[in-house]
Amino acid sequence: KNWAVLVAGSNGWPNYRHHA
């Protein structure tokens, strides 16, 4: 789940949900 935190912190929460 480290990648999720990195993406969410880099692009934002919306990006994390889109990736998931």
Curated annotation (Swiss-Prot):
Pfam families: Peptidase_C13 (PF01650)
Molecular function per GO: cysteine-type endopeptidase activity
Catalytic activity from the UniProt record: Hydrolysis of proteins and small molecule substrates at -Asn-|-Xaa- bonds
UniProt keyword terms in alphabetical order: Hydrolase, Protease, Thiol protease
BP terms from Gene Ontology: proteolysis
EC number: 3.4.22.34
Homology family: Belongs to the peptidase C13 family.
Protein name: Hemoglobinase-like protein 1
